[in-house]
Amino acid sequence: MATPCIQNAFRRKTLPVRIGDLFVGSEHSIKIQSMTTTATTDVDGTVRQICALQEWGCDIVRVTVQGLREVHACEHIKDRLIQQNISIPLVADIHFFPQAAIHVVDCVDKVRINPGNYVDKRNMFTGKIYSDEQYAHSLEHLMNKFSPLVEKCKRLGKAMRIGVNHGSLSERVTQRYGNTIEGMVYSALEYAEVCVAMDYHDVIFSMKSSNPKVMVAAYRSLAYELDQREWSYPLHLGVTEAGSGTAGIVKSAVGIGTLLSEGLGDTIRCSLTGSPINEIPICIDLLKQTTELSERWGEADNPFAIHSSKQLGTRNTLNTPPWGNVYGLLINLTDVQLLTAEPIELLQCLGIDTTTGKIDPTTPEGVVVPKAMRSSPIVSEIEKHLLVFNKEDAPILNPMNEEEWLSEETLSAPFVYFEVTDIHTARRFFSLRQHSTQPVCLSFSLDPHLSKNEAIIDLSARLGALLLDGLGSCVLLDFVDIKLSRTLGFLILQSANIRSVTVEYVSCPGCGRTLFDLLAVSQRIRERTQHLPGGLKIAVMGCIVNGPGEMADADFGYVGSKPGMIDLYVKHKCVKSCIPIENAEEELVQLLKEHGVWKEPE
């Protein structure tokens, strides 16, 4: 494969796909999408939520369609929207029931299917082995079952999204390719081949995962495979089951922001637990941060970055005792902060409780201070707990001065700071220095005029894109809000699978299939378990339709099985079923104890 063009982004050229009254594709603006959380059969409630979503700036809305009752409800929903002159496209979300797709396409503008469960049964981890003959027979069966929907969509001029989800691949695909990025890509391509063979091209693809690293790699790989075949289909971007609050925003921004910066993506959704209304401002801010990249497209040898870190340079940590060989987080402290802050207050902002001696898991490894302040009493106090670096200890490289990057003085320093103003310049820096093993501290400044969400999105997109490719040795954050800086720093490191210092939560955004108050339960479980050690991943999923599969890499799962009942999972195995919801949280704690990961809060 040729070395990709990684320093410049061009919007990947894609076909225009009509969805109702709007078009999706590279010649059109990137659209924002969401999904209702009401029961689809609640026509009044669903219509109200759709209208509210449009008022907030949503361009496309999706509803769940489990069966024929929901199909009939969609007919009424669409009629109601037309009567109210609401033109937002309506999308039907289909799982396990092809007949629902065939019927509902009459009244909606697009259908979304999951290749993992549209024709084949989902993977039940039985260990079944498919022979080549059985595999070929399954592909023929796929063609026979899927082609009626393709034919009807083509005849009616309706669009389709082929939405692959990591963890819900079919048994057949998983047996041959594993629950891998390769499996995700081939799952999509099998369905794409049917569409192409039938000359149907109103198709959009998505490759979602709750893990941004997997998600980004899957989209890059699919885009490459599609373009190799000259299939210029649009992409819908999203990190599925991103969770709630700041952590959910960070995950979404790391994944979606990285791909937008590479010119990939024609529609986006931030799948946050709670009201879908809350997703829209985050999407708007995310697109605003990438406006320049999102509004232009062009040709390049390879306009998105399919590459390994070896093509860009190796990642060497500073390896400073007692830091050790980890990707560290440093906080920049200005002379103003050091001169005006109360010592106890500043230490608390850094995560250090001087009364109890307790160190927060999100305490940075060190701070960077002006050399003139090194001997001050407040810095001496900080040095009792953290590493302290003089700002003048290493060169601070100008992102616009390429000669400086490779100068003898620069290369002879023990490490360097590189100020990251944009992703593409940083990638060029690492590309030009790909043979250097010199540690690089990625330095980020945040505009103090940004809102909190804007700051979260800006840093997550810029830093996350580099971390996902394994670039840099540590991170230096310079932001007036020290506590926010360290919280964000570790959340981004965790989202990029670099470090895990706190419990990670996977939770779906909710939809018409959700069987309990997802946001309230998620918050209660978080409150009961957030003191547990980092590296643990807990999933809270609204239903069993996709919950068990889409929480693919979670250690423990809390999944709605039927109204008022919860199933508990260890990895992908259900170990306790049909637990009354009022007992389920205590049963989850007991399960954590049985597996030796529980400890009592201090």
Curated annotation (Swiss-Prot):
Binds 1 [4Fe-4S] cluster. [4Fe-4S] cluster binds at residues 508, 511, 543, 550. Its cofactor is [4Fe-4S] cluster. Pathway: Isoprenoid biosynthesis; isopentenyl diphosphate biosynthesis via DXP pathway; isopentenyl diphosphate from 1-deoxy-D-xylulose 5-phosphate: step 5/6. The keyword Iron applies. Converts 2C-methyl-D-erythritol 2,4-cyclodiphosphate (ME-2,4cPP) into 1-hydroxy-2-methyl-2-(E)-butenyl 4-diphosphate. This is 4-hydroxy-3-methylbut-2-en-1-yl diphosphate synthase (flavodoxin). It comes from Chlamydia trachomatis serovar A (strain ATCC VR-571B / DSM 19440 / HAR-13).
